[in-house]
Amino acid sequence: MVEDDPGLQSQLKWCFTDYEVLVAEDRASALAQLRRHEPPVVLQDLGLPPDAEGVSEGMATLEEILALVPATKVIVVTGHGDQQNAVRAVAIGAYDFYQKPVDTDTLQLIV
């Protein structure tokens, strides 16, 4: 999971207790985890530091994840009713998207 919000990290770890959950809070740590573990599924927030209010860092992270391990299924998690950027992420290669606030049952179904 690539998420900079510690509260949401905890919620998602709790939601996916049946899975091995790796946590990254920014692009550098996400790419390091990806190289080390090559997870089949990545949940990724589009609003990542240093551009936590925008999506440029999240989109760049998505592109790099897919370039490194193209088979990875990336599910982008967006906030603020940002469906336009979620659709853009799917066009880049994201597997699916989910809008915050997170409903854990629905997110488990997507994964």
Where are these regions (language model features)?
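Short amphipathic alpha-helix used as the core "switch/output" element in two-component signaling
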Residues: A32, A52-A71, R88
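Two-component/phosphorelay signaling modules centered on CheY-like receiver
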Residues: D5-A28, R36, V41
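Short, conserved "switch-loop" micro-motifs in signal-transduction and mechanochemical regulators
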Residues: H80-G81, I92
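C-terminal output helix
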Residues: Q84, Y98-V111
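Alpha2 helix of the CheY-like receiver
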Residues: A28-R35, E63, Q108
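Active-site T/S-Asp motif of two-component receiver
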Residues: Q44-D45, P49
